[in-house]
Amino acid sequence: MQKSNLYSKLLKSPDDAPVFISEKLELDFISHAYSLGLFPWTSNPVTWWCPSPRMVLFPDEIHIQKSIKKALKTYEIRLDYDFALLIKHCSLRKKTWINQEFIETYTKLFEQNLAHSVEVYENDEFIGGLYGLIIGKVFFGESMISLKKDASKIALIKLCEILKPYDFLIDCQVPNEHLKFMGAKEMIKKDFLKILEKKVSLESGFENFQNLL
């Protein structure tokens, strides 16, 4: 089935319920699923979602609080430095469905240069960050963590800064006030899938994410 036909089918999928369920994460299927607008939300079994509205962020629309501007100059940002450490910390949060299968699968995606991380350090100590997948000109955000106040915000601001020249879209998945305050907006499924279909078909514009700093 052509991709455009799959997008049409997803337009009719549930807005606030899983599109389908799978017993496990299939490595070869994941990037295809993301490019169609699907993402996994739970494990055992894995539920795949394409909600509406969708939360998205255009890098040039990021809001930077005055209180964070100083921290941006204080903390060190590293890209793809210790993906395993970041995803491990994300899995240790009280409310998370990130299990060992998820960690192993996304670590393999990192090794395949599909998953990427933005990490924040203070005095060489990890204090937070975020990770997601890059397909075409879309960064599909998966999870973020702050071990120190505003660390995840700093990671997101830095992500926007480095992706802005490449005309990227950041998929933030489901709406929340934290991201809305930072400039993210809600987009209905029809509009999201339309821009997604175009963006994932383009080249990212860079060869190595780690070298964007």
UniProtKB/Swiss-Prot annotation:
Q: Which GO terms describe its molecular function?
A: leucyl-tRNA--protein transferase activity
Q: What is its EC number?
A: 2.3.2.6
TM region(s), chain numbering: none
User: Which InterPro entries has this protein been placed in?
Assistant: Acyl_CoA_acyltransferase, Leu/Phe-tRNA_Trfase, Leu/Phe-tRNA_Trfase_C, Leu/Phe-tRNA_Trfase_N
SUPFAM superfamilies, sorted:
Acyl-CoA N-acyltransferases (Nat)
Location of the protein in the cell: Cytoplasm
Q: One Pfam family this chain carries?
A: Leu_Phe_trans
| Keywords attached to this entry | Acyltransferase, Cytoplasm, Transferase
From the UniProt record, list the reaction(s) this protein catalyses. N-terminal L-lysyl-[protein] + L-leucyl-tRNA(Leu) = N-terminal L-leucyl-L-lysyl-[protein] + tRNA(Leu) + H(+); N-terminal L-arginyl-[protein] + L-leucyl-tRNA(Leu) = N-terminal L-leucyl-L-arginyl-[protein] + tRNA(Leu) + H(+); L-phenylalanyl-tRNA(Phe) + an N-terminal L-alpha-aminoacyl-[protein] = an N-terminal L-phenylalanyl-L-alpha-aminoacyl-[protein] + tRNA(Phe)
Give the main localization category: cytoplasm
At the top of the EC hierarchy, this enzyme's class is transferase
GO-annotated cellular components: cytoplasm
- Gene3D superfamilies xrefs: Leucyl/phenylalanyl-tRNA-protein transferase, C-terminal domain, Leucyl/phenylalanyl-tRNA-protein transferase, N-terminal domain
Question: Its Gene Ontology biological processes?
Answer: protein catabolic process
The family this protein is said to belong to: Belongs to the L/F-transferase family.
Q: Could you tell me what this protein does? A: Functions in the N-end rule pathway of protein degradation where it conjugates Leu, Phe and, less efficiently, Met from aminoacyl-tRNAs to the N-termini of proteins containing an N-terminal arginine or lysine.
Descriptive protein name: Leucyl/phenylalanyl-tRNA--protein transferase
Give the organism, scientific name: Campylobacter lari (strain RM2100 / D67 / ATCC BAA-1060)
> What is the name of the gene encoding this protein?
aat
